[in-house]
C-alpha cells in the first residue's frame, strides 16, 4: 500500500499537548478527589487523540506482538511504520518522553493498530488509559464486537512484550 503524506495540524498538536493539563496528569492514589468533570475532560482529551491517531491509519496488519488483533489475524485500521514513528515523535516533542521510552522504541519500525498505538502513547497516563479502556469497550460492544481482551483491559500487555 502506498504511504500517503499525512500532515497533522497545529490544532491537533495542541490536543496532544493538552494531555499535560493538571487534571489529566494527577497521579492515581493521591488524596485529591477527582470530580465527574475531571473524568469527562480526560475522556474527551483521549478521544480527541484517538481521532488524530485514526487520521494516520492506513495499513492492514498489526505487528505489535502483544495485540490480540494480531494473534487472531483480524483486519482493522492500522498505522504504517512511518506514520507511527511520526506520531510518536510529535507526541514526545509535545509531552516529553514517557518513563517507558525504551519499551516504546521497540515498537517503532512495526505496523501498529490504533488500539496499540493509543495504548503505547498514553501508557504513562494511567488514569486516561483506564478511562479510555472503558470507553473503547463501550464502542466495541455498540458495534457488535466482543472486546478483544477477555482478562484485563484492552491496554494490558499480558506480560508478552514485543519480539525484537
Swiss-Prot record:
| Domain of life of the organism encoding this protein | Viruses
The entry's protein name is Protein 4
The species is: Lettuce big-vein associated virus (isolate Japan/Kagawa) (LBVaV)
Amino acid at each position: 500500500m502506498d504511504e500517503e503524506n499525512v500532515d497533522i495540524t497545529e490544532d491537533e498538536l495542541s490536543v496532544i499537548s493538552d494531555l499535560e493539563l493538571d487534571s489529566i496528569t494527577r497521579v492515581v492514589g493521591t488524596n485529591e478527589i477527582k470530580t465527574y468533570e475531571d473524568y469527562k475532560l480526560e475522556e474527551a482529551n483521549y478521544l480527541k487523540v484517538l481521532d488524530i491517531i485514526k487520521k494516520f491509519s492506513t495499513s492492514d496488519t498489526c505487528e505489535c506482538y502483544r495485540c490480540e488483533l494480531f494473534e487472531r489475524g483480524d483486519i482493522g485500521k492500522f498505522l504504517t511504520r512511518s506514520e507511527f514513528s511520526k506520531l510518536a515523535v510529535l507526541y514526545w516533542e509535545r509531552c516529553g518522553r514517557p518513563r517507558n521510552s525504551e519499551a516504546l522504541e521497540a515498537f517503532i519500525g512495526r505496523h501498529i493498530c490504533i488500539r496499540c498505538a493509543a495504548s503505547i502513547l498514553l501508557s504513562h497516563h494511567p488514569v486516561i488509559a483506564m478511562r479510555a479502556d472503558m470507553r473503547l469497550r463501550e464502542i466495541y460492544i455498540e458495534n457488535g464486537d466482543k472486546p478483544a481482551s477477555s482478562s484485563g483491559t484492552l491496554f494490558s500487555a499480558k506480560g508478552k512484550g514485543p519480539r525484537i
